[in-house]
């Protein structure tokens, strides 16, 4: 009888121990995941080309963004938009602190954020759409 | 700036599905299966030993068979099937959530098999199912829902674009419960339509999170603005404060009409947490808490049932065999459990054929688990909820737009906060009327709602199908021949 009780006691403790083995294994996975996520300079964001009637930039392409990204028809811009409705220096995207902002550089036809004209400077959330000329671009969070 | 090199159309990826091995998930699920089988063995052996003790026999050897091996094996098998489906679909879905959820569900299943089976009985076509079998059935449906949502939800547009429709549906559901709900134990929670009865507040919490995620991601920048000044307070534009007021009113309405303190607390806490996630402003949380405390104070003085709950909580020993019975018995159960617990199946002595803790299978599972697994076991279970919340917040951090991010954070927090509230209530930290412990408590509505939460989280964690592996160079005689010919 005592042997039975002892075995049972050990099985009970084994169950509790296994719960902690599982937690330990999970925590190891989580730590590894966090370490990978914190390694290296993360992307600040990316611009995905949603629509581009003239094919420059290519629809479906994306651009990894630096903290200051200029958009326009001039070839010296970070993102060149070859569109007759875009100005040479059309707009600039800046990352300040925790959020992205777009500024219209007095372009002829304006810059639109979610179909609303940008006056001065406006905050851009991830998932928002920018329109420069006839080209529509969506801001996405960068991959880690 | 590295541009054109990475520029490639999205369409090229994932035209062909390739299975993708998920080593972490496989290993963790194997561990879950072993843990649950050991738990079932411990439970079965303890029950046999107690039966033998009652009959005055002494056992020569102990049979470590599980009490209901079929249900457990079918449960583990279903989870295995979902796992295989994830592998075959080749997506990069989170690998930790499913094992954690499977372990929580399995512990719930063991607990339901251990409690007296006649606590809940339902008859299907002449077949009488007890508590354990019903729970197993609901768990199978829940696992299927998790798998279906994780693989089936490829686009979030149906959640994002119809947020006001969802909100309307939610409020409709709430009103239906207010009007047609039936009262059980002094709380009007259950809605019966024909043969189906359920607790809409469980589903409501998911709808609430979806609506808030849509609303907050759309109006984020406006809410973070400070344009209205009210004395020393700086507030966002008045129209955007309206949802806050509406939420507050809904929470109070639930307390008054439904007499459901737990759900009201859950909804309001989730609302404040999501508001903080979206705007990052602590002043909203402080303002919301002040509103909540003011509301709670007024309700306490106006309504008898609130007063009674609070009195039970402050001093359950004033009436230990009446109003305070449940709280007192739960505390005794936790005390009996101690550090290591009495062992699965060895706790909860019945008093005159009745269980010591009323509603132990729905509102007080933590009291039973605390008695049988002890402090060590309870901490492990709370740790599992923490794992679920951590995964949810990581999914939120990695999501690539605001809606998905806020939605994932909200879904993870709704489960975490619910577990926290019910744990606090069971341990007599806060006054409570019952809500369920996610994934462990008995009940179809609760399991299904939480399955939807987990399924959506898994779908949100999906980083798309992996790029197809590069074509492998064929080795062997035929390939060599071909190369020679070329």
What are the residue ranges of the model-derived segments?
Chain B
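Long, low-complexity, intrinsically disordered cytosolic termini of multi-pass membrane proteins
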Residues: 1-15, 468-486
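Membrane-interface capping segments at transmembrane-helix boundaries
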Residues: 9, 46-50, 219-222, 460-471
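Cytosolic juxtamembrane amphipathic/interface segments immediately preceding
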Residues: 10-21, 58-59, 83, 125-126, ...
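Hydrophobic alpha-helical transmembrane segments of multi-pass inner membrane proteins, especially
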Residues: 65-326, 367-425, 452-456, 471-486
């Amino acid at each position: 009888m005592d042997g039975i009780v002892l075995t049972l006691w050990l099985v009970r403790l084994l169950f509790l121990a296994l719960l902690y083995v599982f937690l330990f294994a999970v925590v190891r996975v989580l730590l590894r995941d966090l370490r990978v996520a914190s390694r290296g300079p993360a992307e600040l964001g990316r611009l995905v080309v949603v629509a581009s009637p003239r094919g420059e930039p290519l629809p479906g392409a994306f651009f990894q963004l630096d903290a200051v990204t200029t958009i326009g028809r001039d070839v010296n811009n970070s993102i060149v938009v070859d569109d007759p409705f875009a100005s040479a220096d059309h707009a600039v995207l800046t990352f300040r602190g925790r959020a992205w902002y777009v500024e219209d550089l007095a372009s002829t036809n304006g810059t639109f954020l979610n179909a609303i004209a940008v006056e001065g400077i406006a905050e851009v959330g991830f998932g928002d759409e920018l329109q420069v000329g006839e080209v529509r671009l969506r801001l996405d969070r960068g991959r880690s | 700036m590295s541009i054109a090199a990475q520029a490639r159309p999205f369409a090229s990826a994932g035209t062909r599905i390739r299975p993708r091995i998920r080593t972490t998930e496989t290993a963790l699920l194997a561990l879950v299966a072993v843990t649950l089988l050991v738990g079932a063995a411990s439970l079965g052996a303890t029950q046999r030993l107690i039966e033998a003790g009652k009959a005055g026999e002494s056992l020569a050897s102990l049979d470590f068979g599980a009490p209901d091996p079929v249900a457990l094996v079918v449960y583990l098998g279903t989870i295995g099937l979902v796992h295989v489906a994830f592998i075959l679909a080749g997506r990069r879905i989170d690998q930790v959530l499913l094992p954690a959820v499977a372990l929580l569900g399995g512990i719930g299943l063991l607990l339901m098999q251990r409690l007296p089976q006649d606590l809940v009985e339902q008859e299907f076509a002449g077949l009488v199912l007890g508590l354990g079998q019903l729970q197993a059935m609901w768990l199978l449906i829940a696992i299927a829902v998790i798998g279906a949502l994780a693989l089936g939800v490829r686009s979030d547009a149906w959640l994002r674009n119809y947020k006001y429709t969802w909100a309307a549906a939610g409020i409709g559901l709430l009103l239906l419960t207010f009007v047609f709900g039936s009262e059980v134990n002094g709380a009007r929670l259950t809605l019966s339509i024909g043969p189906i009865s359920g607790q809409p507040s469980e589903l409501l919490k998911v709808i609430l999170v979806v609506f808030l995620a849509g609303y907050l991601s759309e109006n984020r920048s406006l809410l973070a603005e400070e344009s209205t000044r009210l004395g020393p307070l700086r507030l966002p534009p008045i129209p955007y404060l309206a949802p806050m007021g509406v939420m507050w009113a809904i929470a109070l309405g639930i307390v008054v009409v439904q007499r459901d303190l737990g759900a009201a607390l859950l909804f309001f806490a989730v609302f404040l947490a999501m508001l903080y996630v979206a705007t990052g402003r602590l002043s909203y949380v402080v303002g919301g808490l002040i509103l909540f405390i003011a509301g709670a104070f007024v309700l306490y003085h106006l309504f008898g049932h609130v007063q009674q709950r609070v009195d039970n909580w402050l001093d359950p020993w004033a009436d230990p065999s009446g109003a305070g019975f449940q709280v007192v018995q739960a505390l005794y159960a936790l005390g009996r459990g101690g550090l290591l617990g009495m062992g699965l199946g060895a706790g909860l002595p019945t008093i005159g054929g009745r269980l010591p803790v009323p509603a132990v299978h729905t509102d007080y599972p933590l009291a039973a688990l605390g008695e049988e697994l002890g402090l060590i076991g309870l901490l492990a279970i709370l740790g599992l909820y923490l794992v679920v919340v951590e995964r949810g917040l990581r999914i939120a951090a990695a999501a690539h737009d605001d809606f998905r991010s806020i939605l994932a954070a909200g879904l993870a927090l709704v489960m975490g906060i619910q577990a926290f509230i019910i744990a606090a209530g069971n341990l007599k930290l806060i006054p409570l009327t019952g809500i369920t412990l996610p994934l462990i408590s008995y009940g179809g509505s609760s399991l299904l709602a939480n399955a939807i939460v987990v399924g959506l989280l898994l779908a949100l964690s999906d980083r798309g199908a992996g790029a197809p592996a590069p074509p492998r160079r064929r080795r062997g005689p035929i390939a060599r021949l071909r190369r020679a010919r070329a």
